[in-house]
Amino acid sequence: MTDKRGPLALIILDGFGHSDAREGNAVALASMPFYDELREKYPHTLIEASGGCVGLPAGVMGNSNVGHLCMGAGRVVRTDIERINHDIKTGEFFQNLALNAALESAVKHDRALHVMGLTSDGLVHSSQEHAYALLRMAKERGLRRVYVHCFLDGRDTPPASADRYVAAMRDKCSQLGVGEVASVVGRYYAMDRDKRWERTERA
């Protein structure tokens, strides 16, 4: 007898979660007869959607990017942030051929080094610790002119918090004795991913 299976749909309810608390819990308080019927009639379970379970650093809230990636892969996919964190801890980061080539070129030709990227601890698309590691590399190579261009994170950090992150970068530069903040721009312009040249041009 042929085992006939119907179509299978993976339906993702972004922002949907489980909590035993009812006060302020829109999911628990809402009237969802179809959803309730699914839970009553079919097997179900809870899954973790944050931290190491989705390839993020421990204690870091999940997001749709990593959640969808892990569901699609059927396994935990370590994020780029975690991979770089791992390489910094093991020292592999400091052996990176491309980074070392850039530093060597700056030293050889007495050129300035420009470090640019998202200045944020949102841990979705960046970590400030990565920029700090680059500054340490520049310090060890004896680079004197190092300029940091901060891309502000208006998505994964609290509103009006930019001054805190820029101050942290300045403090780290002062602590290491290398680098200075040369420019500040929002990610809306500097990290546009929709190929809107008018934004990138302004950055």
Indicate residue ranges for each PLM-predicted region.
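Short, contiguous, pocket-lining structural segments
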Residues: 195
